Amino acid sequence: MELRPVWFDSLGAKSMCVLVRTPDLALLIDPGAAIMQPRYPAPDALKAYYLNLATRAIRNAAADATHIAITHYHYDHFRPDIPELFAGKTMWIKDPNRWINRSQWGRARAFLSSLVESVGGKYRERSSAMAEYPDPLDALPLAAQSDRRADLIAKWRKRFVGLTKLWGEGSWVDAAGFAGRIAFADARTFTIGDTTVRFTAPMFHGIESVSYTHL
C-alpha cells in the first residue's frame, strides 16, 4: 500500500487530503482545501496563492483516483465548487441524513444535488427512517460531570434534541438514486479485490462543535 499526502498545510490553505494506492484501487480521501480564517495572520493574496497550489495538487490527484472518500462536509475536506473532481469516481461519503449538524446537512444536499451531471444517477429524497439517537455525551461521564461546564452541557443537550428532530423529520437523501456510484459510508466496510476499506461510525467532536465525522 502506498500513502501520499496530497496537500497538508495550515499556513494559508488548510487541507488534509491523502491519496492511498493499492493494487486494487486509488482512494483519494477528503479532496478539499479552504483559505485560512480571517484571523489567521497572513495576507489575503498569500492565502489565495496557497489555495491555488492546493487546488492544482488535488486536481492532479483526482485524475489518478478511482474512488473518493469524504469524511465530513467542511470545505477543507471537499470542494463542491469543482464537480469535475468527482466525475467517473465511486464515492464513499459521510451519511448526510443523520449524525450531522445543521450546516453540513444543508451543504451535503446542495453538493449531492449538483453531482448528478458529473457522477450520474438522480438526486432523490425520501421519508426519514425511524431511529433512536442516544446522546453521545452519555458515553463520556467525566466530561458530563464537570461543574464548570454545566451551562455548556445544558446548551448542548438542547441543540442535540433539535438535531434529532432534524434527522427524524427531515427528508433523507436516497443513495439508491445514484445507482451505486455514491454510498453512505458510516460504519460500513467495502471490499475491492484484496483491499478492504473500513469506515468507523461517526465520531463525536464535542459539545463545543456539535460535529461528526468518520475515518
Language model segments and positions:
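Zn-dependent metallo-beta-lactamase
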Residues: M1-L53, K155-H205
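Conserved small/polar residues in nucleotide/adenosyl-binding loops
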Residues: T213-H214
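Flexible, acidic/histidine-containing loops and adjacent segments that form or flank the divalent-metal
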Residues: F86-E208
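Pre-active-site segment of Zn-dependent metallo-hydrolases
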Residues: D24-I70, H77-E84, K89, K94-R109, ...
